Curated annotation (Swiss-Prot):
Native organism: Campylobacter jejuni (strain RM1221)
Keyword match DNA-binding: yes
GO molecular function: ATP binding; ATP hydrolysis activity; four-way junction DNA binding; four-way junction helicase activity
Protein name: Holliday junction branch migration complex subunit RuvB
Reaction equation(s) it catalyzes: ATP + H2O = ADP + phosphate + H(+)
Positions of region (Head domain (RuvB-H)): 255-335
Length: 335
């Protein structure tokens, strides 16, 4: 599903985001409580000349978990090695990564909830005792070889904290949940990013882009790049509100940040007249798989009160009817 408001990373996002990503906490906008606590923990660890405790970042995609991991690396003066759980298929894959770490390194594992139970078992002693237990052979002849590891910090990122096993979650000494951004915060991010793109973004233009970015920096920056294209074609050094509106309307992103897929989803629910629709039925109607519905379409709609998720299925809220300019009929329980 190719959507400009897609929360998951596009292949080009890595390079693009890196060029616009802040390198320290001074340049990082938003998530103030998390920044404040991390600053304290980093200062304390440096004062004791120790590694940071292991850190778990959770929350919807695109809110800055990877950026925070890189900032922690910078602030600690440590090297960071990055991987994703789907890349770690065998215990040997993880062992190779761990044995190549140096003292004080940071290991960042994205989508950590996708680690298999067998991989988690290898990770437990590495996190707790900085030790790797490798089993050689099988059956009665099997032997366990213990390999000491350098002290390191594991930073895990997940969009589905509930899928982490309790033993793994409990081994993270610091756990933070990232929240959706305010439009004012996104506007500041956009204006700073525009300067790196050799553009000036007017405040009203930045707010217009922010308003349509689903409260997510990754989407905001992606939209900014497309708006910049419209400005470049018209030989404009300043991104105006008029140009931003033109670009965003052309991209099919409305004033609420909805695209055609969101509108189809909401139209399906509102047509049901507040009768719950199951996830499988929604996926079939939209010709999408269930994971895409849950991970890509629903998080923003749920967080902003457009839909409700019940045991029987999904229901459109009064806010959805308003967004689609439809009449909302109260249920018996609401009257």
């Amino acid at each position: 599903m190719d959507r400009i408001v897609e929360i998951e990373k596009y292949s080009f996002d890595e390079t693009y985001e890196t060029s616009l990503r802040p390198s320290n906490f001074d340049g990082y906008i938003g998530q103030e409580s998390i920044k404040k606590n991390l600053n304290i923990f980093i200062a304390a660890a440096k004062k004791r000349n120790e590694c940071l405790d292991h850190i778990l970042f959770s929350g919807p995609a695109g809110l800055g978990k990877t950026t925070l991991a890189n900032i922690i690396s910078y602030e600690m003066g440590a090297n960071i090695k990055t991987t994703a759980a789907p890349m770690i298929e065998k215990s040997g894959d993880l062992a190779a990564i761990l044995t190549n770490l140096s003292e004080g390194d940071i290991l960042f594992i994205d989508e950590i909830h996708r680690l298999s139970p067998a991989i988690e078992e290898v990770l437990y002693p590495a996190m707790e005792d900085y030790r790797l237990d490798i089993i050689i052979g099988s059956g009665p002849a099997a032997q366990t070889i213990k390999i000491d590891l350098p002290k390191f910090t594991l930073i895990g990122a997940t969009t589905r904290a509930g899928m982490l096993s309790n033993p793994l979650r409990d081994r993270f000494g610091m756990q933070f949940r990232l929240e959706f951004y305010k439009d004012s915060e996104l506007a500041l991010i956009l204006q700073k990013a525009a300067l790196k793109l050799n553009k000036t973004c007017e405040e009203k233009a930045a707010l217009e882009i922010a308003k349509r970015s689903r409260s997510t920096p990754r989407i905001a920056l992606r939209l900014l790049k497309r708006v910049r294209d419209f400005a470049d074609v018209n030989d404009e050094e300043i991104i105006t509100e008029k140009r931003a509106n033109e670009a965003l309307n052309s991209l099919g992103v409305n004033e609420l940040g909805f695209d055609a897929m969101d509108l189809r989803y909401l139209e399906l629910l509102t047509a049901a007249k507040q009768k719950p629709i199951g996830l499988a039925s929604i996926a079939a109607a939209l010709s999408e798989d269930e994971n895409t519905i849950e991970d890509v379409i629903e998080p923003y709609l749920l967080a902003n009160g457009y839909i409700e998720r019940t045991a029987k299925g999904r229901i459109a809220s009064a806010k959805s009817y308003s967004a689609l300019k439809l009449n909302y009929e109260k249920t018996l329980f609401e009257e």
